[in-house]
């Protein structure tokens, strides 16, 4: 419990007092960009990414220690038959990450990214959100605090991902709780739900949001009641990154739901974040639009485990390299426009 009283109090205080961008670093980056050997705007969004890096790190754009952080959790709602896979797959995939056998491992090698995987009490699933809150306030706050430690080893670009059987059900419930609409609008196949399994998934989301309806005006209550440990940990990691001047790339539908909690608590909470990709999960683009973001990639992926964010990190690294490595007109002896 925080020294100030209730477990969430310290997080509410952080969310009220988020640091802003470094305007001097942003101005310096824009000035340098204007001198590089290219027409203004010719690198398109790469230029905006370089400016974003400068603004949120407070220094010239560079990516030297990129990190993919994957948070793994299990969910009591799987007892409702919302997924074709057993919850044991979560732990098995964590072992696969450790052995280097997952897609995210290959992408990290290809783009020279660090990888950390956080096992969040997989033997103790959260409460079934159709019957009770996923977490107590104390447990949710403790998991957020744990997530904040993801960047303790040092990084200058954080990619946020997850693993958790049943967590697209959780993401759909969070989005329905935050934004309204219908369960059908937010529920998708996830790991392959179809037919009766998909119908049970929709019913579970409807039941959960109805059960907790009276508590959904508070985003942190949405998180603890409808979320899960990986949701809380990702929210904590994104928040810690903001406090420590680390830009963030958010992965897919589930990671976007975690980010949405912070955005609902403070409209500026995700200004240091990019959305790495839009997944093929039907509700993801709608969720991204609710955040006022534009994804970097659209590759038809729906794997999770940070893969879309990691691929986007390659683009961010390229943006920084162009900004820092290109010659200026003066250095190259190339004539600038009149």
From Swiss-Prot:
- EC class, as a word, reads transferase
Task: Alphabetically list the UniProt keywords.
Answer: Cobalamin biosynthesis, Glycosyltransferase, Transferase
Q: Which organism is it from?
A: Rhizobium meliloti (strain 1021)
Cited InterPro entries: Nict_dMeBzImd_PRibTrfase (IPR003200), Nict_dMeBzImd_PRibTrfase_bact (IPR017846), Nict_dMeBzImd_PRibTrfase_N (IPR023195), Nict_dMeBzImd_PRibTrfase_sf (IPR036087)
Reaction catalysis annotation: 5,6-dimethylbenzimidazole + nicotinate beta-D-ribonucleotide = alpha-ribazole 5'-phosphate + nicotinate + H(+)
Q: Which gene encodes it?
A: cobT
**Similarity comment text for this entry:** Belongs to the CobT family.
NCBIfam families (UniProt xref): cobT_DBIPRT, PRK00105.1
CDD domains xref list? DMB-PRT_CobT
Source domain of life: Bacteria
Taxonomic lineage is:
Bacteria, Pseudomonadati, Pseudomonadota, Alphaproteobacteria, Hyphomicrobiales
* Gene Ontology terms for molecular function: nicotinate-nucleotide-dimethylbenzimidazole phosphoribosyltransferase activity
Q: What does this protein do?
A: Catalyzes the synthesis of alpha-ribazole-5'-phosphate from nicotinate mononucleotide (NAMN) and 5,6-dimethylbenzimidazole (DMB).
Name of the protein this chain belongs to: Nicotinate-nucleotide--dimethylbenzimidazole phosphoribosyltransferase
Q: Which GO terms describe its biological process?
A: cobalamin biosynthetic process
Q: In which pathway does it act?
A: Nucleoside biosynthesis; alpha-ribazole biosynthesis; alpha-ribazole from 5,6-dimethylbenzimidazole: step 1/2
Offer one Pfam family short name for this entry: DBI_PRT
Question: Which SUPFAM superfamilies does its entry note?
Answer: Nicotinate mononucleotide:5,6-dimethylbenzimidazole phosphoribosyltransferase (CobT)
EC numbers = 2.4.2.21
Q: Where is the active site?
A: 305
Keyword check for Glycosyltransferase, yes or no. yes
